[in-house]
C-alpha cells in the first residue's frame, strides 16, 4: 500500500470543487414562453415555460456532453412563486479535471439527470422567505459520477424601513464526488457542504449606511478511494492512501459609509477571512466555521475618502 509523501502539497493543488477551466466551448438554444392570460378567479398571475438544449465541447470540438433542460414556473397574485426544473445530460467526457494529463486526457462520465424545486413565499415589507430542493446527478452545466442532494432556505426580516436582516443556509451532500489529486491520480469521496450567509443593512437618512455580511462554508470529504485515469477515460482503483479532509472558508466584512459632501464619501471598512484545509474528520459546524476566524489569511481595517468628479 502506497502513501503520498507530500500530502500537504497534494491537497493544496486539488480544486476542492472550485476549478477554473479553459479549452472550453458551449453552444445552445434557450427558449421561453410566458403566459399572463388568467381570469380573475385564478390564483395565478403569470406562468413561464423554458426549454433549453446545449452541447459542451473542448477547443477541439470533442463532445463533453449534450443536455436538455425543461423548467416550469409561475407567480401568484399574492406575490408567491414557484419553479420546477428538470434536466438530462448524455454520457460524455470531462476534459478538464485532469489538467491536460498525458496519461489521462479525459475521464468518462455517466448519464446525468435531476430535478430542482424552488418556492418563494409572498413578498411583503416585513418578512420574505424562499426554499429550494435539488436532487440528481450532475447538472446541465457539469457532469458527476454520483447523486447529490441539496436543500436550502433564505429568510429576510425588516423590522423597520431602514433596517434589514437576511439569513441563508444551504446543506448539500454528494456520493462519489470525483476530485483531482495529481496528474492522472484522482480521489472519490463522500462530499458534504454547508453554507451560511448572514447580512445586515442599515440606512440612517441619506448620509449614513452600515452593511455587515458574513459568508461561511464548511466543506468535508470523507471515505476517500484512489483511482488512476487512463488513455480511454476509465478509472482504475489503485492502492494509494488518501486522507479525508475538511475545508473552512470565511468572508466577513463590516462597511460604514458616510456622505461628507455631495459626491464625497467616507468609507470605514473592516474585513476578515480566509480558507483553511485540514486533513481530519472534524464535522462540527461551529468548529469548522471558527477555524478561519481564529487563523485568518486576511484581517484588515481601511479608511478611505472617495470623491466623484
Identify the residue ranges that each predicted region occupies.
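Transmembrane beta-strands of outer-membrane beta-barrel pores
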Residues: 8-9, 33-37, 51-59, 86-92, ...
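Membrane-embedded beta-strand positions of outer-membrane beta-barrel proteins
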Residues: 5, 31, 47-51, 82-86, ...
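Single conserved hydrophobic/aromatic residue that forms the stacking wall/gate
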Residues: 1-11
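Hydrophobic, lipid-facing positions within transmembrane beta-strands of outer-membrane proteins
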Residues: 25-31, 66-70, 113-117, 129, ...
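Short loop/turn motifs that connect adjacent beta-strands in outer-membrane beta-barrel proteins
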Residues: 36-48, 75-84, 124-128, 162
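Outer-membrane beta-barrel "beta-signal"
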Residues: 252-270, 291-309
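Residue-level signature of outer-membrane beta-barrel architecture
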Residues: 33-35, 55, 72-78, 120-121, ...
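Extracellular loop and loop/strand-boundary signature of outer-membrane beta-barrel proteins
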Residues: 15-19, 56-57, 100-105, 136-142, ...
